[in-house]
Amino acid sequence: MSDSKMDKLARMAPLPRTPLLTIWLAINMALIAQETGHKRIHTVQAATGGGSMLGDVNISAILDSFSVSYDKRVRPNYGGPPVEVGVTMYVLSISSLSEVKMDFTLDFYFRQFWTDPRLAYRKRPGVETLSVGSEFIKNIWVPDTFFVNEKQSYFHIATTSNEFIRVHHSGSITRSIRLTITASCPMNLQYFPMDRQLCHIEIESFGYTMRDIRYKWNEGPNSVGVSSEVSLPQFKVLGHRQRAMEISLTTGNYSRLACEIQFVRSMGYYLIQIYIPSGLIVVISWVSFWLNRNATPARVALGVTTVLTMTTLMSSTNAALPKISYVKSIDVYLGTCFVMVFASLLEYATVGYMAKRIQMRKQRFMAIQKIAEQKKQQLDGANQQQANPNPNANVGGPGGVGVGPGGPGGPGGGVNVGVGMGMGPEHGHGHGHHAHSHGHPHAPKQTVSNRPIGFSNIQQNVGTRGCSIVGPLFQEVRFKVHDPKAHSKGGTLENTVNGGRGGPQSHGPGPGQGGGPPGGGGGGGGGGGPPEGGGDPEAAVPAHLLHPGKVKKDINKLLGITPSDIDKYSRIVFPVCFVCFNLMYWIIYLHVSDVVADDLVLLGEE
């Protein structure tokens, strides 16, 4: 009955007079409405063909049939051959690689493939593979895969869980999930910062041994992929490789897969921040070689500043690295730079020390020269007195020479020599008179030789002729500091000034210096020959003291070099050594660090 007929019936029917009639009309109208609704439903189904509803019902039935007699606690083929789980990975990004923490973080797609015969279904047209949501994973068995060297992992859930399941009609399962994992990466920093690191991710079953699960790379050598957009601030991805291995533990043997990624460090940062500044600091330390050695504040300040700067640079570099016990390549470079800078500071210390020693030697030689000149003047005065001998053999007065009558054995005989050094006449006359009063009455008369008298002459005559020397010649000048040239001969400054071998107090006769015959020459020794040391006035004083101009060059040198020579040599030696070190350093370390892992799939060759 149509709607128009119902409207006509309602208009034609009189108003109900009893409740029974009202109920009857309500029932009829309800039946008419139900019939009309069924007609509308059949009309919609006829328009759409009715296939989608049938498909929905079939897929739901397939999914519902999986739960019938399915136990997700039991692996497929339990008691039979192990389940083969294929694995593929595709690295989306690598966010960090830390030397301090020894780990790296990467974001990747992780896919697993296995077969579960219990999930097989009859193939229908258009229904070869079922793509279902992540909730379905709770209803089936999945491998208990974990990452062996994982430190921290993150599962992405925005906007929904980043995971899907695909069930093939043959029972093969594909599970894909997106993960971000921080995994440990032990590093060898021996060649840092020219090192290459090989980091890996290890995949293994947590509970199933090889009798239950075996892992394999599902697509062979192409099972691991790395996006070409992967980049890091300090590293470049050189390539990757994959391995399959068996691990023996106390609980059994386990199948394990390893994906290894090799990184090569970029040198730009370390060249700009460490290598170039440290090299320039070494070059700056060489500036002190061109400064005047008397500019102590400038050279010391420059040396100390460069040393402290290198120390700060080394400390800041090692602060950003782990506390390792072996030597890194950057430690070799920085250590050498520090030694070069420190050596330049020690070079100035050496120059200053040598200059001080040479200055002290000059002052000492000037004092010796002054004393030698005074001695020479004394000898010249004595020789002049010898040129005009006194018949009485007694020369008094300042600078006079008195010869007493005493013989060689006389107790008081001798020659009184008074060389004027500001002494009064009473000294010369007094000593001469003393010699006469104590001389032997029958001693032969002594004469003084016309030959010039030196220190050696006087010393040899002492005791030979029974002479004694008094006066200013015995006013000795003694120094505790050893003269370098006399030191090698065992002499002191005192010996140098007083004639070398013999001192003024060597009164006893030596070998061959026996008493001469009476009346002999005043300077004669045994046999009347010339005494040791000669009669030259300059023989009493070494030539290098009487003629300082001849040894001026030696005075300005210490160990054969001068302080200026050290600066000149340093200007050449230091740069040459540093350049040679740099050549050897870069050639050796760049060669030994250029190591590529075997069977590595380079990033551009995928």
From Swiss-Prot:
Residues 376-451, 482-542 are annotated as: Disordered. Disulfide bonds join 185-199. The keyword Glycoprotein applies. InterPro entries: GABAA/Glycine_rcpt, GABAAb_rcpt, Neur_chan_lig-bd, Neur_chan_lig-bd_sf, Neur_channel, Neuro-gated_channel_TM_sf, Neuro_actylchol_rec, Neurotrans-gated_channel_TM. Residues 45-268 are extracellular. Keywords: Cell membrane, Chloride, Chloride channel, Disulfide bond, Glycoprotein, Ion channel, Ion transport, Ligand-gated ion channel, Membrane, Postsynaptic cell membrane, Receptor, Signal, Synapse, Transmembrane, Transmembrane helix, Transport. Residues 357-568 are cytoplasmic. It is found in: Postsynaptic cell membrane; Cell membrane. It is a multi-pass membrane protein. The chain crosses the membrane at residues 269-291, 297-316, 333-356, 569-590. Glycans are attached at residues 58, 253. One of its GO terms (biological process) is monoatomic ion transport. Residues 381-395 have a biased composition (Low complexity). Residues 1-44 form the signal peptide. GO terms for cellular component: chloride channel complex; postsynaptic membrane. It holds the Pfam family Neur_chan_memb. Residues 430-443 have a biased composition (Basic residues). SUPFAM superfamilies: Neurotransmitter-gated ion-channel transmembrane pore, Nicotinic receptor ligand binding domain-like. Residues 396-425, 499-536 have a biased composition (Gly residues). GO terms for molecular function: chloride channel activity; extracellular ligand-gated monoatomic ion channel activity; GABA-A receptor activity; ligand-gated monoatomic anion channel activity; neurotransmitter receptor activity. NCBIfam families: LIC. Belongs to the ligand-gated ion channel (TC 1.A.9) family. Gamma-aminobutyric acid receptor (TC 1.A.9.5) subfamily. This is Gamma-aminobutyric acid receptor subunit beta. It comes from Drosophila simulans (Fruit fly).
